């Protein structure tokens, strides 16, 4: 049985409130008159912005997808959350996967207003936009084709190995920098000398 909502304001769940963007997201929700629930992997007393939310929860790591999704569902139900605002790539990736698993495969690019498992709106880009943004090669091609900005030239490692094997790799300009196509920040970055 669902309990009645005591506070009639819309409620936003802001994740990763210890991240760089949290302060501005919280301030924006506050300007809109929202009740704000925050969560982070660290205890509230370690997170400065926890003082700026109405309620703060300690979240499991998003890399533990099952625990993280169960946590979000529990908080959304308990706090009557209307909007979920994920702030880190890893959280967006987990929610994207969950959203895809919950959608009808024939309607892959359709995003409904409310994400049924949470009974809340996921405040994140659509499926195709996230796919584009999370793939460095696709994003480079997208930007280059439209002349939107200069990008750092990149090639797939397998393509480089195949093209340069006959020359003993002497035609390459070293050091090479390699990164996973879906990496974030500098995770997985390596220099080849």
Regions found by a protein language model. Give the residues of each.
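Short histidine/acidic/glycine/proline-rich micro-motifs that form metal-
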Residues: 20, 62-63, 127-132, 157
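Active-site nucleotide/adenylate-binding loops and adjacent lid/helix of ATP-dependent enzymes
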Residues: 103, 130-193
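Short intrinsically disordered, low-complexity coil segments enriched in acidic
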Residues: 1, 126-127, 193
